[in-house]
Amino acid sequence: MSEILGFGIAGNFALHLEQAGEADDFSLVKTDDEYAPKGIFPFYIKGSDSFLGRNCIDNGYLYLPNDKNLNIQMEPEIALRCELEYENGKVKSIKPLKFAAFNDASVRNDKTATKISQKKNFSNGSKGIGNEIDIDKFSLGGICDNYSLVSFLQSQNELIRYGECAKLSGYSYFYEKLLEWIKDRLNTQENYAVLENLSDILKNANYPNEMIITIGATRYEEAGKNRYLKPGDICYVVAFDHTKFDLSSITNAIKNGSKLPSSVSILRQEVR
């Protein structure tokens, strides 16, 4: 992770922002399409002197912030590892190479935060990524057609479904539409409201040729909507081929600790 940038997309799954209590944060952000995501935020910038320079991915543990008054919530997402190509200081093309389950855990009650990024990188283990799966083509007919995302939280002997089980095709923007939107945002997003100027970030990072971008969190199940993370909890985010596995078989595998094939992307993080 130390060689790349980490970005995330806000508002790419209907009703997630409302559930997370973040809709008001984006009230000043206007979009041409009512279904469009709200914007892109950084969660890691290599070499930055700010908190965003802290390598915040740990695939085994999620470290809560030192301030114990802050509420942290899991955000189950899909991450894309992408190759970037530039022309005249602008992003020319984005090529997704791999995808994986991702936890974009976020602070929910930091009233001092003025940018969405300030809620994202709160410790050396505020993010986690599962085993990565090769993308044959990021378009209809490709491998992502067959994948769904689900998340669980284990607390003592109880396992709850934290986020809805959702097909990747359920993202508001996906495939070519998503890539065109990301390219536009990377080139034109300005420092406004809770968002930041992304072209400046790319320039200051010497135009990296690779990035991880998380493409939006799913909606929460009722049990996960107001359940904040506590030490000892175990977070699971799972991306699976729904033509080969159903939800009950994935749930039982997580519950029983059964081994699943590498074609299933699994993130398991113990909260500390």
Predicted regions and their residues:
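Short, charged beta-turn/beta-strand-edge "cap" motif at the junction between a beta-strand
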Residues: 14, 217-223, 240-245
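Loop/turn positions that initiate beta-strands
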Residues: 208-210, 230-234
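Catalytic nucleophile loop of clan PA
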Residues: 223-229
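Glycine-enriched loop-and-adjacent helix/strand subsegments that border the catalytic/binding cleft
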Residues: 2-203, 227, 249-271
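Glycine-rich beta-strand-to-loop/alpha-helix junction loops that act as flexible
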Residues: 9-11, 209-222
